[in-house]
Amino acid sequence: MSAKNDNVSTRGFFMTTDQPIDVAIIGGGPAGYAAAIYAARANLTTTVIEQGMSGGQIATTNEVENYPGIPLLSGAELGERFQQHAEGLGAQVTWSMVTGIDYDADAALFTVHHDMGDTLASSVIACMGATPRPAGFAGEDTYRGLSL
């Protein structure tokens, strides 16, 4: 565990501080958590801001059978493992919807505005993922989370 980061998950609560963090990551999918893991390992104060659930789109999948090293688990479980990995290295997770970002060139700081307050950060990584498009065939919803 890094000396700079505390193993903290806000789980819906956000502790405001006037002190900027090193990295704010918008999005808690695989890319967001991969970024958080690398940033925390580099001893950077790191916060993942996610509006939904850990894992992003993969969390809606019933069964994941093609993740290397793990034969079978649910998408929600995989998302939870992403979160636990990042938190175990010191990243903080905040459950909130980002509403905007401002940059102050004089201070060289970003302000990430979200439902739980503002986060000041030296850098921002946007990992906002994708939204699946419906294919448009009859009965499509029946297969959602299984093979679509």
Label each residue range with its predicted role:
Residues 36, 40:
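Gly/Ala-rich phosphate-binding loop of Rossmann-like dinucleotide-binding domains
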Residues 30-35, 145:
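Short glycine/serine/threonine-rich phosphate/pyrophosphate-binding segments
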Residues 59-118:
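N-terminal Rossmann-like dinucleotide/flavin-binding domain of flavoprotein oxidoreductases
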Residues 41-60:
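Glycine-rich FAD pyrophosphate-binding loop
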Residues 2-26, 42, 47, 93-148:
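FAD-binding core/adjacent interface of flavoenzyme oxidoreductases
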Residues 27-30, 51:
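Glycine-rich Rossmann-fold phosphate-binding loop(s) that bind the pyrophosphate
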Residues 56, 65, 133:
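Glycine-centered loop/turn positions within well-structured domains
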